[in-house]
């Protein structure tokens, strides 16, 4: 599919990324139409996908996307949560139209409803979960590109990209590779330089883990608590106030109110 050109061949760096993201690991079951993409079957029953054919189909899919004059007529779809972030990032960098989450039935066939759309090309994450848009696309003759596992059905799919579509890292990497190849074919980025967008942006993030990471990052930004230094205060000498009162009493400094020399008679005669 790459036409035998070295410039379109699979690079060692991309192969390493695919192996790390487990893109080559399929499921234990094999659809009879996907047997041509299976390289080998392991002893534990897992089928190994031929990454050479994966890259050839990815380049073919990128050429089909670039052939559409208006990029917004290309719809990228993912009903599964693990592919929704990758779909949104792909649409951001390639100017395509994303549908992340639940697909509205009749969006391609029912012209009365407000959500009616007329795309020229579909790219779906999983034929099993995205069966509704694939079925509706077959009614109105819309070509479909799909990331398919070894057990995925290929009915109504025009270009199948064999890969592990059940792993969040594998799905994110495949959308990233497809976006990079589309931009290279358009001439937006060069093949000789590295694309500055990292693949981590396309990976699915668990909301709970994201909240924990944000909380930990916010905690690191907080200033450390102030530690008060110990201050040595001078110790005052204790005074025995009882001794001072006793000394004043002995010295005669206290008046005796019982020895009053003035006598007063409260009688009516006024005499003492």
From Swiss-Prot:
Keyword line: Cytoplasm, Developmental protein, Nucleus, Ribonucleoprotein, Ribosomal protein
Primary location class: cytoplasm
Region (Disordered): 250-272
Localization in the cell: Cytoplasm; Nucleus
GO cellular component: cytosolic small ribosomal subunit; nucleus
Keyword Cell wall biogenesis/degradation: no
InterPro entries, per database record: Ribosomal_uS2 (IPR001865), Ribosomal_uS2_C (IPR032281), Ribosomal_uS2_CS (IPR018130), Ribosomal_uS2_euk (IPR027498), Ribosomal_uS2_euk/arc (IPR005707), Ribosomal_uS2_flav_dom_sf (IPR023591)
Any single biological process term in GO: ribosomal small subunit assembly
Pfam families linked to this entry: 40S_SA_C, Ribosomal_S2
Biased composition (Polar residues): 263-272
Protein transport in keyword set: no
GO molecular function: ribosome binding; structural constituent of ribosome
Subunit structure: Component of the small ribosomal subunit. Mature ribosomes consist of a small (40S) and a large (60S) subunit. The 40S subunit contains about 33 different proteins and 1 molecule of RNA (18S). The 60S subunit contains about 49 different proteins and 3 molecules of RNA (28S, 5.8S and 5S). Interacts with oho23B/rpS21.
Annotated family: Belongs to the universal ribosomal protein uS2 family.
Cited NCBIfam families: uS2_euk_arch
Its job: Required for the assembly and/or stability of the 40S ribosomal subunit. Required for the processing of the 20S rRNA-precursor to mature 18S rRNA in a late step of the maturation of 40S ribosomal subunits. Required during oogenesis and imaginal development.
Protein name as it appears in the record: Small ribosomal subunit protein uS2
């Amino acid at each position: 599919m790459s036409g035998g050109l070295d410039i379109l061949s699979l690079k060692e760096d991309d192969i390493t990324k695919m192996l790390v993201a487990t893109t080559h690991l399929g499921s234990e079951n094999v659809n009879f139409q996907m047997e041509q993409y299976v390289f080998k079957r392991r002893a534990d029953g897992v089928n190994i996908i031929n990454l050479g054919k994966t890259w050839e189909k990815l380049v073919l899919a990128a050429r089909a996307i670039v052939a559409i004059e208006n990029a917004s007529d290309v719809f990228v779809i993912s009903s599964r949560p693990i592919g929704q972030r990758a779909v949104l990032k792909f649409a951001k960098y390639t100017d395509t139209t994303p549908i992340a989450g639940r697909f509205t039935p009749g969006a391609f066939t029912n012209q009365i409803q407000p959500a009616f759309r007329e795309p020229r090309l579909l790219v779906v994450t999983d034929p099993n979960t995205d069966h509704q848009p694939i079925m509706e696309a077959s009614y109105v003759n819309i070509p479909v590109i799909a990331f398919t596992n070894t057990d995925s059905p290929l009915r109504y799919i025009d270009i199948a990209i064999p890969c592990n579509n059940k792993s969040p890292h594998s799905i994110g990497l495949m959308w990233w590779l497809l976006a990079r190849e589309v931009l290279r074919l358009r001439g937006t980025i060069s093949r000789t330089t590295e694309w500055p967008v990292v693949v981590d942006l396309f990976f699915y993030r668990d909301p709970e883990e994201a909240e924990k990471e944000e909380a930990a990052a916010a905690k690191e930004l907080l200033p450390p608590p102030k530690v008060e230094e110990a201050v040595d205060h001078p110790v005052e000498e204790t005074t025995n106030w009882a001794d001072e009162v006793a000394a004043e009493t002995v010295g005669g400094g206290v008046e005796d109110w019982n020895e009053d020399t003035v006598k007063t008679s409260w009688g009516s005669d006024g005499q003492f």
